[in-house]
């Protein structure tokens, strides 16, 4: 029995199980580019369902449609963090902060602030 528990723990650890991030992805602000908004909304649906690679696909498409959106960079950061790619998460969180336009969801994010502080923001 102990062997099965150990095998299960190793398998879950190797599969990159999601972290319980306390902050959800952000919706785009009113007036956002329509295709960016629809792609971002799809990304949020996938993210909330735990399908982080699918979420990344849609968040990247939203970012392509509007690269000036701090929210899409924030969402990319969350999804990359869930996938275990801390380097890309940090890159996107830095960009999100630069493009935040006063959005408290980005500027006051404990995830962003803690991660960037640890990695010299």
Regions found by a protein language model. Name each.
Residues 41, 75, 109-110:
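Canonical tetratricopeptide repeat
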Residues 61-64, 98:
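Conserved structural position within tetratricopeptide repeats
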């Amino acid at each position: 029995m102990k062997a099965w528990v150990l095998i299960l723990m190793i398998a879950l650890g190797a599969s990159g199980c999601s972290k319980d991030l306390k902050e959800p992805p952000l919706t785009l602000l009113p007036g956002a580019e329509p295709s960016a908004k629809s792609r971002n909304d799809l990304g949020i649906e996938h993210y909330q369902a735990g399908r982080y690679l699918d979420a990344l696909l849609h968040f990247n498409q939203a970012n392509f449609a509007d690269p000036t959106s701090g929210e899409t960079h924030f969402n990319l950061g969350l999804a990359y963090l869930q996938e275990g790619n801390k380097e890309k998460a940090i890159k996107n969180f830095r960009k999100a902060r630069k493009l935040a336009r006063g959005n408290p969801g980005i500027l006051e994010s404990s995830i962003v602030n803690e991660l960037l502080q640890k990695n010299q923001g």
